[in-house]
Amino acid sequence: MFIRRLHKFSYNPQYKLKCGLEIHTQLKTKYKLFSLSPTSYNEPANTKLSYFDVGLPGTQPKLNPEALLLALRASVAFNSEIQPYSSFDRKHYFYPDQPLGYQITQHYYPLAKNGYLELNKYDNIKDKRIRLEQIQLEQDTGKTVNYDDRINVDYNRANTPLIEVVTKPDFENIEQVQAFVRKYQLIVSHLDICTGELETGAMRVDANISVNGNPRVEIKNLGSSGEIVDALQFEYMRQVRLLQNGQGINQETRGWTGEGTESLRSKENAVDYRYVPDSELPAIRLDQQITKQLQKSLPELPDTILERLINKPYNLDLAHAKNLLYQPEVLKYYETIFASISSNANKWFFQELLAAFAKRGVEFDVDIVPPSMLVDIVKKVETEEISLAAARIILKYIVENKSTNTLVELVEILDLKKPEANDELQLAVKEICQQIIKNNPEVVTKIANGHKNALQVLIGQAMKATKGKVHAKDFKEQFIELLK
């Protein structure tokens, strides 16, 4: 979640913030972008490499079609215009984590242009369209690890496929940035394009920020949600102070230290990357129908799911709908039970099932109480084969013991079978109610004085005495009769 550490932060209405983002997103492919090395995130250093990944002479790149497909899916999800022609270029620079001496990217002819992402009420933001300049496919670099006396380089990450998404400078406050990044994470993870995790490096964010139209400052490699907020707040306040003191803003690249931003290089010292087309990779030529075909293949996007869940027939509040959206397995579970017990699905799922897990401090697991089990329990209660109290006892037992018994077996194990309706049962119910009335004169007085809710106290004691075998309505009818 996003956090705000600069508690004294506030916007100065005389100094307008403008911000744009560059988001680098690792694609969830089996193999790397231009080689058959497996993508690797937690393997020992330098164990998932090919000759091409480390730039050995004579090796050549070959485009991974899975990476191209994921990049195209992202382009469609973000309403971008897929280009019929795109190509790869070499971005030259020298750094230990880039063994080729250049990065393969799409500088001149990117994969997609002119997209947008809508922020709205579901993001707790007034309607705002954030335009996307382009989406390009490119390589990730290796990873450097600094020690006191040396730098170690791990090339497992080198040549991992990325998309770089570049927005227009449309953000007018940091809240919009938060909402955009959160929504972006949700969409790429929902479509299984990327894990969407900032903290693991699967997503990395660069921010360009300016105040009152002055030169922009780029903040590089913001690696967590907290860093994005803190760095933008700090940099906005730094630029405002400079302007208030009559000083200018230098166009430069800065880095986040954890406490502030520091200058890395100025515009005058900016790197000349000497972009040239990559002669070893053919251009990508796509059919004009590719966008329509991809649109048909995409699942429901998050906003569409939320819109569906908060309206008929589900009628969920937005908080419940969002909780389901962020947990795809749980959403599937909910929709499965809703198809069978629609009228009672919300009550049983949120008030009974999730409560049974929460009361025991256990995280909800769709495998512990399968949808078919919950549906069976609900139907047994509806046909009065077991009571509501018995159903709660069964859920409690399953959660605590991870029971795989059938419902019939659980009713037997827990001795919850409802007694046969006969005169003997009616007499037993009457005797229990009479004893409870006798033992609770204060509650009876409250009921006599018009406190109708006090009747639930008596019913609760009766249910406890019978271990949930008898329905609450049977006790309620008997208590009302005896208390007339």
Swiss-Prot record:
InterPro entries: Asn/Gln-tRNA_amidoTrfase_suB/E (IPR017959), Asn/Gln-tRNA_Trfase_suB/E_cat (IPR006075), Asn/Gln_amidotransferase (IPR018027), Asn/Gln_tRNA_amidoTrase-B-like (IPR003789), GatB (IPR004413), GatB_Yqey_C_2 (IPR023168), Gln-tRNA_amidoTrfase_suB_CS (IPR017958), Gln_synth/guanido_kin_cat_dom (IPR014746). Its main location: mitochondrion. It holds the Pfam family GatB_Yqey. GO terms for biological process: glutaminyl-tRNAGln biosynthesis via transamidation; mitochondrial translation. Its EC number is 6.3.5.-. SUPFAM superfamilies: GatB/YqeY motif, Glutamine synthetase/guanido kinase. One of its GO terms (cellular component) is mitochondrion. GO terms for molecular function: ATP binding; glutaminyl-tRNA synthase (glutamine-hydrolyzing) activity. It catalyses: L-glutamyl-tRNA(Gln) + L-glutamine + ATP + H2O = L-glutaminyl-tRNA(Gln) + L-glutamate + ADP + phosphate + H(+). It is found in: Mitochondrion. Keywords: ATP-binding, Ligase, Mitochondrion, Nucleotide-binding, Protein biosynthesis. NCBIfam families: gatB (TIGR00133), PRK05477.1-2 (NF004012). Allows the formation of correctly charged Gln-tRNA(Gln) through the transamidation of misacylated Glu-tRNA(Gln) in the mitochondria. The reaction takes place in the presence of glutamine and ATP through an activated gamma-phospho-Glu-tRNA(Gln). Subunit of the heterotrimeric GatFAB amidotransferase (AdT) complex, composed of A, B and F subunits. This protein may be expected to contain an N-terminal transit peptide but none has been predicted. Belongs to the GatB/GatE family. GatB subfamily. This is Glutamyl-tRNA(Gln) amidotransferase subunit B, mitochondrial.
